Amino acid sequence: MASPRELTQNPLKKIWMPYSNGRPALHACQRGVCMTNCPTLIVMVGLPARGKTYISKKLTRYLNWIGVPTREFNVGQYRRDVVKTYKSFEFFLPDNEEGLKIRKQCALAALRDVRRFLSEEGGHVAVFDATNTTRERRATIFNFGEQNGYKTFFVESICVDPEVIAANIVQVKLGSPDYVNRDSDEATEDFMRRIECYENSYESLDEDLDRDLSYIKIMDVGQSYVVNRVADHIQSRIVYYLMNIHVTPRSIYLCRHGESELNLKGRIGGDPGLSPRGREFAKSLAQFISDQNIKDLKVWTSQMKRTIQTAEALGVPYEQWKVLNEIDAGVCEEMTYEEIQDNYPLEFALRDQDKYRYRYPKGESYEDLVQRLEPVIMELERQENVLVICHQAVMRCLLAYFLDKAAEQLPYLKCPLHTVLKLTPVAYGCKVESIFLNVAAVNTHRDRPQNVDISRPPEEALVTVPAHQ
């Protein structure tokens, strides 16, 4: 029996790790959040214009945001790469042998890429986005998963509401490269005929015939659900997420608290009150919200003084969330960047090297913050119009989710004081409007300096620090 290895504390994340031959021992989940002992293959099921790609993209964005390496594989895009010019629905007719051959080759090419991603590139979840409307096709994909050691989870989207289908068709026409520069009525007619090509052979997931499979069936964009044999934690997270999203038109407003007394002094964290300009911003925010005339707006704040003072000026009910509190800077709370460089130069350099994963001594990392904020994302997905008054690091995390930003980009997203970001979900993404409320404030954004080496001189460490009192 091997003797226990020595432990050492990782300087970046502040977690204890075993050492082997003088080097830290790596483990399978070094780069991501490990929630399952084997990769997961998510297989979309459903007729065209049922929201499969919408679900695929949202699910991929969510899983990547919480730290699970995920990639979407859209078979339609593989087909467009092979067949450069789409002509008509006849390509999808069941008796079109050439079309069938090309579609099968594209599906196999996508599965090869799935295998590469999950088995060679360290991926945890692959989303296979295609119609997969026959039991035979789904069995082929399931067998592929079994042969490669993947857990397979099916997500079927069923729509019988004509209004939902019509709205989906409009979105597909707007977003699909197949119908660029095509007459609208002609495109609609062709797409309806394309759907008919699948309808006769469509076999929905069946509670008896498919009782051994793991799946969720989503009816009419979340009116009801059927869930069967959830196999592990990651599948339960997927089900929970899919049961929270909706497509009702709405806007989410994100802003930071008004300028604080510590912002003026260039100090991070703490629980200060608003500066005079911060109080002026709170009044301007109240006027802005009133002018917007937003139906049933909900207002959320953190439990920190500066966000609550900002919300008080609105004169409306608001809800305080502890999870919306600013990132905990640990031993560096209420310090300036200059003081951190003087007292903890190693920590300052390590944070610049990997700002997303770096954890303050006795504090948090952005990675920790994302995990803390997941309940907020779930509730934002459930809600309609919401104003979130929060903090710089928190706002960056929320913004990264809605804009699908990578972990490396997240800590450097610009979220200036006294500016409201209006996020409006659209077909496969999010429209962003930035509204500055004309109240001056200090700049608190610090870019990554060019020199992030531990031995750098102080002036190179501090070159990107914004001006302050």
Curated annotation (Swiss-Prot):
Region of interest (6-phosphofructo-2-kinase), ranges: 1-249
Any one Gene Ontology cellular component term annotated for this protein: cytosol
Keyword DNA repair carried by entry: no
Post-translational modification Phosphothreonine, affected residues: 444
EC number: 2.7.1.105, 3.1.3.46
Binding positions (ATP): 46-54, 168-173, 348-351, 392-396, 428
Cysteine disulfide partners in this protein: none
Keywords attached to this entry: ATP-binding, Hydrolase, Kinase, Multifunctional enzyme, Nucleotide-binding, Phosphoprotein, Transferase
Region (Fructose-2,6-bisphosphatase): 250-469
Regulation: The most important regulatory mechanism of these opposing activities is by phosphorylation and dephosphorylation of the enzyme.
Reactions the enzyme catalyzes: beta-D-fructose 2,6-bisphosphate + H2O = beta-D-fructose 6-phosphate + phosphate; beta-D-fructose 6-phosphate + ATP = beta-D-fructose 2,6-bisphosphate + ADP + H(+)
Residue numbers binding beta-D-fructose 2,6-bisphosphate: 256, 263, 269, 306, 337, 351, 355, 366, 392, 396
Cross-referenced Pfam families: 6PF2K (PF01591), His_Phos_1 (PF00300)
Site positions per UniProt: Transition state stabilizer: 391
Taxonomy, superkingdom: Eukaryota
List of residues binding beta-D-fructose 6-phosphate: 79, 103, 131, 137, 173, 194, 198
Gene Ontology MF annotations: 6-phosphofructo-2-kinase activity; ATP binding; fructose-2,6-bisphosphate 2-phosphatase activity
Active-site residue numbers: 129, 159, 257, 326
GO terms under biological process: fructose 2,6-bisphosphate metabolic process; fructose metabolic process
Family to which this protein belongs: In the C-terminal section; belongs to the phosphoglycerate mutase family.
Assembly and oligomerization: Homodimer.
Function as written in the Swiss-Prot or TrEMBL entry: Synthesis and degradation of fructose 2,6-bisphosphate.
Name of the protein in its database record: 6-phosphofructo-2-kinase/fructose-2,6-bisphosphatase 4
Organism: Homo sapiens (Human)
